[in-house]
């Protein structure tokens, strides 16, 4: 029987709650629960985590909570010491731990987007954007009548951006040394009557990821490292990888999506207590 106690990190986000346990150097099966009510999703996630990992309440030493929903929690969970941790710190700790880096620009892509600069133990919030998962679902709901992210991803699979976006090659015959001809000159700047549902779905995903990736590249310019670590729910969208790879041809950055990236903030919450 493992007697080392577990530190639990819970990230109560805008649309989902993520939970993860850390015992020594081991990450215990992370889980995600969808819920609109922060308290319901907190206890739902915690109960599921305890049950599916066959844990007892006594095996848990402390619980770290973070995320926008943590403001609704004002007492300990099942009499276990419960500590609120600032979300930006969690993003930094989690991003560095999952990527194995000592310093990086960490981008948390959830309902909106937050960017921190992390160097060893120093975490600095540098900004963000309201463009994120909420933008993606809001626009896809209005433009395509699609309200589920999985359906949007599936619809976008065969999408052709050249029916939606204006590319550099569409407006310039000259080769620009710092701008590949396939780069976007204007998102949705060339939308044609021939654009299919798939094309528009891909255009929306591309718009959101290009905006986030470009902002991250600018934020990283004043950093000592060119590495950008992506965490949060949006990292699970397959097209994220492709869009960021294309941005690497324009900017001097390396975009990294580590394993368990969607749980980065929850991991950071648990680590913030362990570091103490």
Question: What kind of region is each of these model predictions?
Answer:
Residues 3-44:
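Short glycine-rich, Thr/Ser-proximal phosphate-binding strand/loop in the N-terminal lobe
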Residues 93-98, 136-140, 255-276:
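Glycine-rich phosphate-binding/hydrolytic loop that grips phosphoryl groups
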Residues 177-227, 262:
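Adenine-nucleotide phosphate-binding core of ATP-dependent small-molecule kinases
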Residues 23, 32-35, 51-87, 118-125:
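Short beta-strand-loop/turn "lid" adjacent to the catalytic site in phosphate-handling enzymes
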Residues 81-88, 245-267:
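Conserved phosphate-binding/catalytic loops in two-lobed NTP-binding clefts
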Residues 122-176:
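Glycine-rich phosphate-binding loop plus the immediately following alpha-helix
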Residues 65-72, 218-247, 262:
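Glycine-rich phosphate-binding loops at beta-strand->alpha-helix junctions
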Residues 2, 73, 79-107, 112-122, ...:
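Conserved phosphate-binding catalytic cores of ATP/NTP-utilizing and phosphoryl-transfer enzymes
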